[in-house]
Amino acid sequence: MNIKRIIVLVLISASSGLLCAQRKTVNMSDRYGILTVTPLDKYTGAASLLKTNGVRSLTDVSYGDGFGGVSQKIHVGITPQGKDLTESYEYNSLGNLQSRTLPVPVLSEGTSGNYKQILKSAQEYYGHSNVCSRFAYEASHRSLLLKEFGVGDEWTGKAVSKKYSCNLESIPVQRCKRYLVSAGGELVESDSPYADGSLRGIRSEDEDGNMHWEFYNSENQLVLSRILDGDTFFDTYFVYDEYGNLVFVLPPGYQDHPDLDLYAYIYRYDYLDRLVYKKLPGCAPSYLVYDAAHRLVFSQDGCQRNDSLWSFFVYDVYGRVVVEGECSNSDKHVRTAGETVVLGTLMEGDTGLAYSGYQSSFDLVDPCVYVVNYYDTYDFRTRNGFSAYNFPEGTVSATGNLTGSILCTHGSSGFIYSADYYDINKRIVKSLSSRVNGGMDTYATEYSFQGSPLSVLHTHTDSSGYSLTERYTYTYDHSSRLTRVSHQYDNNPSVLLVEHTYDELGRLQTDKLDNGIYATDYAYNIRNWLTGIEGGKFSQSLHYTDGLGVPCYNGNISSMTWKSGAGATPRGYKFSYDRLGRLT
């Protein structure tokens, strides 16, 4: 069992009273809720997580609204100051989400996890009256989303809106060309357009009024994506064959210059609907060949075709890639791969492809091996190349995992041999790899109970046996946020590389580098968009709806100011965009 995913779920009613978790008394209030406890330390049983016994854990409480929805989520004591981070939800009579309040840190008096009225607290914390995302729906049984109003006083009255319609030949913006795929796989533009109403249309408009249409066919496949810039349309068409496979993508450039070679994405399939041909705009096509088990065994791009080369992939009986490389097989020979199952069998002795021990069941002409993989065991240690480095035997079962590999270094005849070792939770705890010029690199990793790395010890040994070590140490807070990274070289004093501090919403607030000599502060707006970076040598402010530029409410940066040093003259830039969001 993966201990990182063990979660305790408890359905609690009003009679359940108080529970203890994460050294806090959790009051489930007078409502029905679900208590979720994720352990951060080793524990003796599920019941121990609900007691104050020193076992650290992450505790969440979800309160239901009585109709299957969640009315409030509380992350107990998760903020840097140990406050509850609380967010609330409201639904309409049909069960659709109608309002979502921004998460707000709330200091609990005596107990944590109790249901709270947080609207006023959120308004005070953010300094905005508009702290709820609101959703408006179509008044029908379909309950289609019509408008989404975001948070922030600057966005009051502004929404991301949707309109639902269909294709209409009489209205230019809702007119769609009809492309077909011929029996021979060629693109054909039909003389007869789509019948009115045969395509489902959705018009989206962001907070700045930029409009985007999408049209879908009866199979719910996207047929046309249309972006508007005034009266100019930027159309991307998607063309499917009779089996529903995407065959052509025709971007806006193709509409002005209908050249498939320069502007189109082209895909072709075999009789089993496997992709066998792929061509990107302006590029030579790539070919893909599969074996009888539907696994990719050969591929070729334009550059390889000029040199009569194919990439090949050999698999074991479990479908895992064991050998990768290039070969000089003829096109006719490659095509016959689909008639068989290409397998790599591990043989005894230093035989097979690149002396790896793997023998392909399909003949390869002049194979050049780039990657060899071994799985499940460490029997490869005695094979050619590995035996020179004395790789240790694994002490924990690695069944199902990659245990060793050989990597060919381009431009030389050298190989890099490596092995990975796991703990009982299938995490890599030691990784060893040889070096082309001799010697070894070893990485040993220690993990927390939850699976976060606590330390990584790197040992570099040269060909003469001389070793150097460096250790990275990672520290986390009570909510598993990374707070410190330290580095130690050999036996020298440890150096604090970086120290992170976070605000009450979990956003990175300050970075301190090199034992705190250099510090950088970060600022955000109510939508969590980065608005400022402040350091001793450099500062920068990003403006969206304020500043000197034209206000942008959709997330584009309208202007930027910066300066280097405390007394430097501020400088800045203003940005403008077209309706496609492109910088102009």
Regions found by a protein language model. Give the residues of each.
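Beta-strand elements of repeat-based all-beta scaffolds
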Residues: 21-576, 582-584
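Bacterial Sec-dependent N-terminal signal peptides
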Residues: 1-26
